[in-house]
Amino acid sequence: MNLHEYQAKQLFARSGLPTPVGYACSTPREAEEAASKIGSGPWVVKCQVHAGGRGKAGGVKVVKSKEEIRAFAEHWLGKRLVTYQTDANGQPVNQILVEAATDIAKELYLGAVVDRGSRRVVFMASTEGGVEIEKVAEETPHLIHKVAIDPLTGPMPYQGRELAFKLGLEGKLVQQFTKVFMGLANIFLERDLALIEINPLVITSQGDLICLDGKLGADGNALFRQPDLREMRDQSQEDPREAQAAQWELNYVALDGNIGCMVNGAGLAMGTMDIVKLHGGEPANFLDVGGGATKERVTEAFKIILSDDKVKAVLVNIFGGIVRCDLIADGIIGAVAEVGVNVPVVVRLEGNNAELGAKKLADSGLNIIAAKSLTDAAQQVVAAVEGK
C-alpha cells in the first residue's frame, strides 16, 4: 500500500525530520488559504497521486502568486494526471500539496528497501538526487552507496556517518544526515514498510538538509498491526479491480492485453503469461487465485476479469496439487453459468483428478474449451481471440 507525499512528510515531521512547511488542500480556496498560512512566496504546488514523473506531466509547479495557486488547483483538482508510471487513464487528483519553495544547492537521494537476498533492510544513498534511482543503478551503479541494517542491533549512527562521508558531506551536514538516516530507519522498522524514499534530499543554499519529497510503501501483510497507516489508504488511487480482488484474497494486477488469465500459484501465473505472449497473445491481467480455489473465489475472479472490457477470451490454468481438479471444474462450471460468460474460456487442468475434471468440463454444455497441455491452452486461447 502506497502513501501520498503529504502523508509521508507527516510521518517524517513526527519523527523530527526536516520538511518544508506545507498543507494538503482539496479545494482552490483551501490552496489559497494554505499559501497565506505559509507566508510570502514563492510556493510549490504538487498534485498528490501515487505515481512518479509528476513534474514532467505538469503536476508540479513553482508559483509566485495566489492567483497562480488558484489556477493550478482549478486546473487539476478533479482531473486525472497521466505520467510515465501510470496507465493511459492516469490517476485522480483529489488533493494538491502547497509548500514553501526551497532554495536548492544540491540534490541527494536516500532510501531503503527489503533486500530478500541478504534478508536485511538495505539503505541506499547517492549524490544523484532528483533522478529515478533505477536509472542511476543502470547507468552509474558506482554512485549508489549501501549499508545493511543488522536485525539484532538495528540502525546505528555510525552507518549514517559512513554514508554521509561517501556522499562527500562535511561538518554539520554529517550530523544532519545521520539524524535523517536514523529517523528513516526507525520509521521503516516501526511502521512495517516495504519501501521508504526521499528523492530528493536536498542541501539548501543555507547549508541545511531538508526532505523535499517523500515516498512510502507499506507491507500489506503487516497492515493489521498498523491501524493508523490503514486509515491513510486512498483507494481512489488503486485499480478498482485490484481493490475488489484484495477483498477476496486474490492477487490481481491489470495489464493491457485482451486475454484474461486465472491461475493458482504466482509462479505458474507468470509462466502462463509468458507462454501466452510466446504464442502471440497479450495477457490482460495477472490473477493468482491461490491454493483455495473455491467456487466462490473462482466466480469472483471471473467477475473481476470480465469487468475489463478489453478481455476477449479467458485462460484458466489450474494445477491440482492439494486441491482436486474435479472440484475446480465444478467451480469453473458454476462460475461460468452464474456470471454469464460471453467470451471463449479455455481451461487447462493438470494433477489430482485432472481427467475427471476435464470430462466434467466437456459434459457441461457450456462454452468451455478443455486444453490438453499448457502449450495447447495458449494456442487455443490465442486462436479464439483471433477468431480462428
UniProtKB/Swiss-Prot annotation:
> Which Pfam families does the record associate with it?
ATP-grasp_2, Ligase_CoA
Annotated ATP-grasp domain ranges read 9-244
- Cofactor notes: Binds 1 Mg(2+) ion per subunit.
Query: Which reaction is catalysed here?
Result: succinate + ATP + CoA = succinyl-CoA + ADP + phosphate; GTP + succinate + CoA = succinyl-CoA + GDP + phosphate
Cofactor(s) needed: Mg(2+)
Q: What functional role does this protein have?
A: Succinyl-CoA synthetase functions in the citric acid cycle (TCA), coupling the hydrolysis of succinyl-CoA to the synthesis of either ATP or GTP and thus represents the only step of substrate-level phosphorylation in the TCA. The beta subunit provides nucleotide specificity of the enzyme and binds the substrate succinate, while the binding sites for coenzyme A and phosphate are found in the alpha subunit.
- Subunit info? Heterotetramer of two alpha and two beta subunits.
* Record-given protein name: Succinate--CoA ligase [ADP-forming] subunit beta
Please report the organism this UniProt entry assigns to the protein: Cronobacter sakazakii (strain ATCC BAA-894) (Enterobacter sakazakii)
Upper classification of the organism: Bacteria, Pseudomonadati, Pseudomonadota, Gammaproteobacteria, Enterobacterales
Q: Which gene encodes it?
A: sucC
